[in-house]
Amino acid sequence: MTDSPRRRFLMMAGGTGGHVFPALATARALQQRGHEVHWLGASGGMEERLIGDTDIPLSLIHISGLRGKGKLALLLAPFRLMRALGEAYTHLRRIRPDCVVGMGGFVTGPGGIAAWLMRKPLVIHEQNAIAGMTNRWLTRFSETVLEAFPGSFGDQTVTRCTGNPVRGEVASMDEPEQRLAGRSGKLRVLVVGGSLGAQVFNQQLPQALALMPEADRPDVRHQCGEKNLEAAQAAYEEAGVNASVEPFIRDMAEAYGWADLVICRAGALTVSELCAAGIGAILVPFPHAVDDHQTRNGQHMVKAGAAILVPQPRLTPEVLAETLKDLATDRKRILTMAKAARSLARPDATERVVNYCLEAANG
């Protein structure tokens, strides 16, 4: 499908897969409709590698977070922000987009202000159940404010609830009844710590599996994060447990299709992909997430019966082993959780975000 006239969009997203992948899904959908897409990211961020490997032109600015960086970083922050704003403004003048789309990460702050200074329509999208500080601040400069979960900005901001764009190959997966039909034997458990890994899973899951009788242990595929590969492999070896340990999984649709159950954080992208794929989960929210937004994200699935939520302070090898043991012998519950997850899916999320972007670009 091609929309007319052809428009030029600048995507802004970076820092984590939770920002990059929804933005990439949106970018691909815009390209499929015949539009031109550019990307603004932060130098040194994961977007530099992920988008650098695509056909999308990538521009970078120098920007990073301020939390926990000390007094010197706070003193230098205004100067660094001004430099980042200048870099963003220069890129926007060169690219001349018809619409700027902010999907999260530090880059969206200076990029959003640069768009406002150049009178370019700004669309922002909040992936989490509680809006982040940068997006809250940018609402006053935005043409359109989109959110994945209702009420993430509170009652004072006019928003459009779209759901989270997910990768097309995940959104098009078979229904749980088809995917899980006829499965028997050991439970297949996919462990995902997010694009950066989760040390608590790397440490505790091998110990939990060691507590289970070998006949009851699930088959495990574990994404541990690139920096944690050797430590995670050593933890499994020390526990005397076999598992397939990978630093990063690029084909998540294939991984979800293999799994009966997922153990993971409750990041916005993860929750949205679990729902799109139709797969139940044991959720362990990141305890230091700003405003505890991961717990709010996870409650979306828990209330529907699609997930079990375990706060990290309560997560022990014993608790994890007992939970897995209960699920390993109850495939009926596994299917029920998967169907509940699929009922929460927003398969039209990408299309809705794209349509709002086109509306802004066309004025």
Curated annotation (Swiss-Prot):
Belongs to the glycosyltransferase 28 family. MurG subfamily. Its main location: membrane. It is a peripheral membrane protein. Cell wall formation. Catalyzes the transfer of a GlcNAc subunit on undecaprenyl-pyrophosphoryl-MurNAc-pentapeptide (lipid intermediate I) to form undecaprenyl-pyrophosphoryl-MurNAc-(pentapeptide)GlcNAc (lipid intermediate II). CDD domains: GT28_MurG. HAMAP family: MurG. It comes from Marinobacter nauticus (strain ATCC 700491 / DSM 11845 / VT8) (Marinobacter aquaeolei). One of its GO terms (biological process) is cell wall organization. This is UDP-N-acetylglucosamine--N-acetylmuramyl-(pentapeptide) pyrophosphoryl-undecaprenol N-acetylglucosamine transferase. It comes from the Bacteria. Its EC number is 2.4.1.227. Pfam families: Glyco_tran_28_C (PF04101), Glyco_transf_28 (PF03033). Keywords: Cell cycle, Cell division, Cell inner membrane, Cell membrane, Cell shape, Cell wall biogenesis/degradation, Glycosyltransferase, Membrane, Peptidoglycan synthesis, Transferase.
